[in-house]
Design a protein with these regions (language model features):
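Small-residue-enriched transmembrane helix starts and helix-helix packing motifs
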Residues: 1-23, 127-142
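Small-residue-rich hydrophobic segments that form or flank transmembrane alpha-helices
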Residues: 14-74, 141, 151-205
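Cytoplasmic-side transmembrane-helix entry/capping segments in multi-pass membrane proteins
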Residues: 71-82, 103-108, 127-137, 170-174, ...
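Interfacial loop-to-transmembrane junctions
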Residues: 214-236
Length: 248
């Protein structure tokens, strides 16, 4: 899956892991949203997704509050929906040409950046409705499973719930960690993985975790709104580059 990588590809991979980890540390989300589209510039979507296997797990598990799981009770309807949706979306992902998936990733990233830049929120009555949470989760899961970009619609939902900064961070990590279960169940069902592939994703942990650690250390020292907006501008550029590569 990762044989014959040239120096440029390795540098792009390192850059994506460092930037994704740092962003996760600073604003509590954004690791796969940042890293995945950059990786798809130099790797097929399936390889890019597996490269992030261990980094995504460890980047999120460290911020989950396992001592008080009742904090996540409010997310149960959304979680059921997104879990089911990912199974459907992942089926589409693994049965569609990689070029089409890459284009879908580019478009999703650009739309996500625009919506978040505008600060879009779901109506307070809707976001508190369990049926809406279930259906919105299902839709989010289908889109996320199909493009492997799980964060965008999930972030909009969590922002709309108006959690405190700490609880928002914990809920993002919990949901991302939970969605990895159906995502990678489907991955291992359809893709052949060898021992060397696990070694590569293990090595990817080093830059990702180090940069997340740095991001966590300066989380309260960087104006988060400014950093978030710069991240969204960068995402738009990356999305356009992905589209440019696969459309022209």
């Amino acid at each position: 899956m990762f044989s014959n990588l040239d120096q440029i590809t390795l540098l792009v991979i390192l850059f994506s892991l460092c930037l994704g980890g740092f962003t996760k540390g600073v604003i509590s989300w954004g690791f796969p949203v940042i890293s995945l589209p950059i990786l798809t510039i130099v790797l097929p979507p399936t390889s890019a997704l597996f490269l992030l296997f261990f980094p995504i797990i460890f980047a999120n598990i460290r911020e989950i509050n396992f001592k008080n799981m009742r904090n996540y009770k409010k997310l149960i309807p959304f979680s059921i929906g997104i879990f089911s949706g990912i199974l459907i979306g992942s089926y589409i992902f693994h049965n569609t040409k990689s070029e089409i998936i890459s284009i879908a990733i580019g478009i999703t990233i650009i739309i996500f950046a625009f919506i978040n830049f505008k600060g879009f929120k779901i109506n307070e009555i809707l976001v508190s409705n369990k049926l809406f949470g279930l259906l919105y989760g299902l839709f989010s899961g289908i889109i996320g499973g199909m493009t492997t970009v799980l964060g965008p619609l999930m972030i909009i939902y969590l922002v709309s719930l108006n959690f405190s900064k700490e609880k928002f961070s914990q809920n993002v990590s919990f949901l991302v960690f939970a969605t990895l279960i159906p995502l990678y169940i489907m991955f291992f069902t359809y893709q052949k993985v060898v021992v060397n592939d696990f070694l590569v994703t293990s090595l990817a942990l080093i830059p990702a975790m180090f940069m997340q650690y740095l991001g966590l250390k300066i989380r309260d020292k960087i104006p988060q709104k400014t950093f978030k907006n710069l991240t969204l501008v960068f995402l738009t550029v990356v999305g356009l580059l992905v589209l440019y590569k696969h459309l022209l």
